[in-house]
C-alpha cells in the first residue's frame, strides 16, 4: 500500500473518532488543552494500537488464507465502509449531558471507534504495508482530526457528524475496491 493510500486510509479510520469528538465538544462550553489532549491521545492511541493487534492476528493465520488475502481486505474494508455509511444515515444524537471526558467513557469510546482499525490491521497482514508508517499515520492523523473536530464542533454543531462518517465509509470502500483490482488484474 503506497503512502497516499495510507493517508486516505488513516483519514477514513479517523472519521469515527472525528464524529465522536464533535459530540464531545458539545458538552463543554469552553475547551481547554486537557480536553484536546484527552480526546486526541485516547482516540489516536487506540486507532494506532488496534491495527497492530489486527496485524498480528492476521499473520498468525496468513498461511491459511494467503490465496484469498485480497478478497479478505476488500470484504473487510467494504463492510466497515458500509457500516460507517449506514451509521451516518441513522441521525444519532450526541449525548451532551453525560460526563464526557471520564476514564471509563473515553476508554469505551476509544475501543468502540477503533474496532474498524483492528479489522484493517488484519488486512495489513496480507498486503505490502509498512506497518510502522501505517500505525504512525493512523495515530497522528486521528489525533489531528480529533483536535480539529473539537474546534469545529464547538462552532458548527451536530450537522457535520453524519457527513464525516459518510465520507470515511466511502473512502474505505474505494480503498477496498482498489486493493481487489490491483490483486486481480495487476499481480
Swiss-Prot record:
Coiled-coil residue windows: none
GO CC, alphabetical: plasma membrane
Signal sequence annotation: none
Presence of keyword Cell membrane: yes
Sequence similarity: Belongs to the MntP (TC 9.B.29) family.
Record HAMAP family: MntP_pump
Protein name: Putative manganese efflux pump MntP
Native organism: Campylobacter jejuni subsp. doylei (strain ATCC BAA-1458 / RM4099 / 269.97)
Amino acid at each position: 500500500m503506497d503512502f497516499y493510500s495510507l493517508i486516505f486510509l488513516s483519514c477514513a479510520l479517523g472519521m469515527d473518532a472525528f464524529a465522536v469528538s464533535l459530540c464531545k465538544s458539545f458538552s463543554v462550553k469552553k475547551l481547554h488543552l486537557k480536553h484536546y489532549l484527552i480526546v486526541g491521545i485516547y482516540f489516536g492511541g487506540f486507532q494506532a494500537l488496534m491495527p497492530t493487534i489486527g496485524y498480528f492476528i492476521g499473520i498468525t493465520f496468513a498461511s491459511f488464507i494467503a490465496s484469498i488475502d485480497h478478497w479478505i481486505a476488500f470484504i473487510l474494508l467494504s463492510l466497515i465502509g458500509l457500516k460507517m455509511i449506514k451509521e451516518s444515515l441513522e441521525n444519532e444524537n450526541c449525548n451532551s449531558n453525560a460526563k464526557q471526558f471520564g476514564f471509563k467513557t473515553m476508554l469505551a469510546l476509544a475501543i468502540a471507534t477503533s474496532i474498524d482499525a483492528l479489522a484493517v490491521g488484519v488486512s495489513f497482514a496480507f498486503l505490502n504495508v509498512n506497518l510502522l508508517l501505517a500505525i504512525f499515520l493512523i495515530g497522528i492523523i486521528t489525533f489531528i482530526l480529533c483536535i480539529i473536530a473539537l474546534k469545529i464542533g464547538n462552532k458548527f454543531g451536530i450537522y457535520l457528524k453524519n457527513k464525516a462518517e459518510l465520507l470515511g465509509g466511502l473512502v474505505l470502500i474505494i480503498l477496498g475496491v482498489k486493493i481487489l483490482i490491483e490483486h486481480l488484474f495487476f499481480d
